[in-house]
Amino acid sequence: MDSTTATAELGWIVHPPSGWEEVSGYDENMNTIRTYQVCNVFESSQNNWLRTKFIRRRGAHRIHVEMKFSVRDCSSIPSVPGSCKETFNLYYYEADFDSATKTFPNWMENPWVKVDTIAADESFSQVDLGGRVMKINTEVRSFGPVSRSGFYLAFQDYGGCMSLIAVRVFYRKCPRIIQNGAIFQETLSGAESTSLVAARGSCIANAEEVDVPIKLYCNGDGEWLVPIGRCMCKAGFEAVENGTVCRGKGRSAAGAHWQLGGQAGKGSGLELTARRSVARLSQSSRCSAS
């Protein structure tokens, strides 16, 4: 899911209605996108929630969330009360189908699972606004294991002045690869950032396993690690194309002979010349002997 690709309103659910508001905004390249903003800093006891639509898990075990946002510096707001915040909370809720309503799940931690409190590295002031200076923060968080069909994300504001510019949800996987003479299929990363998921390889054509069963491990960043075992070309074959193909050793030579010899059943010019030379040599030998 990538909110920046939306061509119409995102239509996420807000609670209460006086909290988050969907507006047209701009990304760091000044492209028009749909964003959400909230700025109720002069009212105490804020508890504003924003919930995404249902996001399907698609087999992933660990979910990554990239957030781009801007936050107003509380000290730059005149007469702002001490309740002004420069952070917000990220939550998720798992479900087997799109079951959420305006009141379910309840707008609170438990049933929602808190991922983290998100803080800005940079905040903007009134001076930045006047000069149209964009100070966009990018933060990535992950959570898992997830096991149900999908999930929702929620963003909780409790007294800040901020704009949620973009949200991208993704998972990591190790790509299909040929290594050590074996094919390893695409493999999803594990449920934890430190997980190593074992993947069994299958030998390429005309190759066979040697020593121990061949495997690779997919780490949490979608990278292949720790190769174990290997496949080697069978007798009569050799590895070519960086070890991705086992080719018959005589195939290249046979092809070269076919090109020199011309079409099957017909002698080439080289062959005819050679035969005539041999015939002349035989005649010369007979004449000398007589």
Placement of each model-derived feature along the sequence:
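Short beta-strands within extracellular/lumenal beta-sheet-rich domains
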Residues: 37-66, 75, 136-141, 164
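Short amphipathic, basic-aromatic surface patches that mediate peripheral association
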Residues: 69-80
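Extracellular beta-strand-rich recognition modules
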Residues: 63-69, 149-157
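Extracellular glycan-recognition surfaces and repeat-rich motifs
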Residues: 1-37
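Short coil-to-beta strand junction motifs in C2/discoidin
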Residues: 78-91
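Basic polycationic patches enriched in arginine
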Residues: 251, 275-276, 280, 286
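Conserved N-terminal submotifs of small, disulfide-stabilized extracellular modules
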Residues: 20-27, 34-42, 107, 112-146, ...
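Leucine-biased recognition of intrinsically disordered, low-complexity hydrophobic segments
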Residues: 260, 270-272, 281
